């Protein structure tokens, strides 16, 4: 059998990069070390669709440029991973607070099916929530800490302990099947009682926004295609215009977001927006922007910064993020500081 993707030596991979894709390779040893550390598939597969001139050829760039673009991608992935974990913890804390205040701290009561919708937003309480959490509660291998510690030391497992062991996806599913009273309590905390959107709009933004953050977090954690990924359920930029001033650009009559913003909200920018929305202090929001800039520019002198700007411009094309991203972020911070 002639395989579609046969094994290629490093020398053969370099030849393909040079002959098929037109990548400029002046330092052969450097190119080989790049392929050893990154892999041919990650180097070309992750970037060629945006940078190519035609169906085959990338835009006459050097192997060094591809390498730097890959490092930038990984730096931004690490940044998103860091803040996705922060948002996950924040969300679980809010969920635990609302559920404990509504149903108490006895697991048999706060996980009683009568307290939840049977089915909502594609989520079944019994099949998608309870059955998953039950695996943690009945674990015999004592793998789930700190839940197992509470099983051994105390007479109950409060939700703020149990939720430390459930997955981000399970916590989102639990949110989906909350009844309106509890769901409204959650979104009022997350939106700081903002009345600029309807209840249904807030519910959808949290559901889709958190799902998108989880997806991008998983892509980064498992070394999957990150930059060019587009979500199936994008957040609606028009709904975010009031709560994230400066981050969404609208048409002159303010009836529709610009097309670039519609496209951006199907990619990585959707995760950036929701993370900023959920960070609940100006200090955290400012740190988020600072860390984002450091992920792109840190450790470089002025001359090298010009190269990083070019790299980031190409990265914005890959991700569909607005190229004036940092201008928008600083405008948002300025508005926030004036409000609070």
Model-assigned labels for residue ranges:
Residues 223:
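Acidic/aromatic/glycine-rich contiguous surface patches that form carbohydrate-binding/processing clefts
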Residues 1-215, 227-340:
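Extended intrinsically disordered or low-complexity regions, especially N/C-terminal cytosolic tails and loops
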């Amino acid at each position: 059998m002639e395989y579609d993707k046969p094994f290629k030596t490093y020398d053969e991979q370099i030849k393909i990069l040079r002959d098929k894709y037109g990548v400029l390779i002046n330092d052969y040893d450097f190119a080989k070390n790049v392929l050893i550390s990154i892999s041919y598939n990650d180097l070309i597969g992750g970037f060629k669709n945006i940078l190519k001139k035609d169906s085959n050829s990338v835009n006459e760039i050097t192997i060094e440029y591809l390498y730097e673009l890959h490092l930038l991608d990984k730096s931004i992935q690490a940044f998103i991973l860091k803040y996705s974990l922060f948002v996950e913890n924040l969300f679980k804390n809010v969920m635990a607070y609302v559920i404990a205040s509504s149903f108490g701290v006895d697991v048999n009561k706060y996980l009683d099916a009568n307290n939840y919708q049977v089915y909502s937003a594609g989520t079944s309480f019994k099949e998608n929530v309870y059955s998953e959490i039950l695996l943690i509660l009945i674990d015999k291998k004592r793998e789930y800490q700190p839940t197992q510690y509470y099983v051994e030391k105390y007479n109950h497992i409060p939700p703020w302990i149990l939720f430390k062991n459930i997955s981000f996806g399970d916590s989102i599913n639990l949110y989906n099947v909350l009844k309106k009273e509890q769901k409204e309590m959650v979104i009022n905390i997350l939106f700081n009682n903002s009345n600029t959107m309807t209840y249904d709009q807030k519910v959808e933004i949290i559901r889709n926004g958190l799902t998108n953050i989880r997806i991008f977090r998983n892509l980064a954690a498992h070394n999957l295609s990150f930059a060019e990924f587009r979500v199936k359920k994008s957040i609606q930029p028009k709904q975010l215009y009031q709560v994230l001033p400066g981050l969404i650009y609208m048409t002159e009559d303010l009836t529709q977001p610009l097309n670039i913003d519609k496209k951006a909200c199907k990619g990585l920018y959707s995760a950036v927006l929701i993370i900023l929305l959920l960070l609940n202090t100006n200090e955290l929001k400012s740190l988020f922007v600072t860390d984002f800039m450091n992920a792109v520019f840190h450790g470089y002198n002025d001359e090298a910064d010009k190269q990083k700007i070019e790299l980031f411009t190409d990265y914005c094309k890959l991700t569909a993020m607005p190229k004036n991203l940092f201008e928008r972020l600083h405008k948002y911070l300025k508005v926030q500081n004036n409000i609070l």
